A protein has these predicted regions:
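A conserved acidic beta->alpha catalytic loop
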Residues: 37-45
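Conserved donor NDP-sugar-binding/catalytic core segment of glycosyltransferases
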Residues: 92, 96-143
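A recurrent flexible, glycine/aromatic-enriched loop bordering the glycosyltransferase active site
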Residues: 149-156, 162-185
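Glycine-rich, basic loop-to-helix element that forms the pyrophosphate-binding segment
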Residues: 59-75
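Short beta-strand-to-loop acidic/aromatic patch adjacent to the donor-nucleotide binding site
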Residues: 80-92
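A short, conserved alpha-helix in the catalytic core of glycosyltransferases
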Residues: 176-183, 188-193, 203-231
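Active-site donor/metal-binding and catalytic loop motifs
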Residues: 227-246
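Short, acidic, metal-binding catalytic loop of nucleotide-sugar glycosyltransferases
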Residues: 22-31
Length: 267
């Protein structure tokens, strides 16, 4: 399996970051972890040090897109890595999930592949919901304490499907959009960079950056984001979005896009 750079974006909420790190301790994949912190005011940086993870910090808040582009720069500049994952801090990654994503890349000619999550966790892209493809996973799939059990069940179903010569039913499939809480890319993604350092356009400071990249770069080149139907990542949906708007005072008061987003939700 190729080597993975896992870039986790953070802004406060260190309790969720800690839970994410605990899930990483159980993995046996070949990954390096870098945390890109956007000016947290809690103990997030200290938590990163406690777990031994590199943490890139800011002197002022720059927004999520800036963090994503920083992750891309690390990936592009180091030939050691075959894959880049950009992920929120409010996730739990079960053992086996990353390996399934890599297998999808090895089998299919996609530049970006994403896992399934819960219906709530995938937000605006319900196509990624595990409940579309597996019966009997709910309600336990919505409980974080069962996140590893869900991945294990998926792999059991995969093996049963293989034995019945119906593995095609779980083939990776392309989608019209993806949710930005967790997405994995290979080196082909470099073809879509905006300039030598940025993969994502910088006019979207915090939200809609994945949609813009999807429509402008992926779909327009017939390189759709793809869903791996044998990989599951639990996402605490809502923790890393609107809660941040309420606390990200400097950006929300000075950047027009943030003001617009706050107005849309009555903030």
């Amino acid at each position: 399996m190729g080597k993975i750079l896992l870039a986790i974006t953070t802004y406060n909420q260190s309790n969720y970051t800690r839970m994410c790190f605990e899930s990483l301790k159980k993995l046996d994949d070949d990954i390096d972890v870098i945390v890109i912190d956007d000016f947290s005011t809690d103990d997030t940086v200290d938590v990163c040090k406690e777990y031994g993870y590199e943490c890139e910090t800011r002197d002022k808040p720059m927004g999520l897109t800036h963090s994503w582009n920083s992750a891309y720069s690390h990936f592009k500049s180091d030939d050691e890595y075959d894959y880049l994952i950009i992920a929120n801090n409010d996730i739990l990654i079960p053992k086996g999930a990353l390996g399934e994503l890599v297998k999808s890349f090895e089998q299919w000619p996609y530049s970006m592949i994403v896992p399934m999550s819960t219906t709530n966790g995938v937000g605006h892209n319900p196509t990624q919901s595990i409940e579309n493809y597996y019966q009997g996973m709910a309600p336990s799939c919505n409980d974080p304490k069962y996140y590893q059990e869900i991945q294990d069940k998926i792999l059991d179903v995969k093996e049963q499907t293989r034995k019945s010569n119906n593995l095609y039913m779980l083939d990776t499939s392309r989608m019209k959009m993806f949710n930005g809480f967790f997405f994995m890319m290979n080196k082909n993604i470099i073809h879509y960079e905006q300039n030598k350092t940025d993969l994502f356009k910088t006019d979207k400071i915090m939200t809609k950056n994945e949609d813009q990249f999807n429509w402008d770069c992926l779909i327009s080149n017939n390189d759709f984001p793809a869903l791996c139907k044998t990989s599951f990542v639990f996402h605490y949906k809502g923790v890393s979005t609107f809660d941040v708007f309420d606390n990200y005072t400097e950006i929300s008061n000075n950047v027009e896009e943030w003001k617009r987003q706050r107005d849309l939700r009555g903030g």
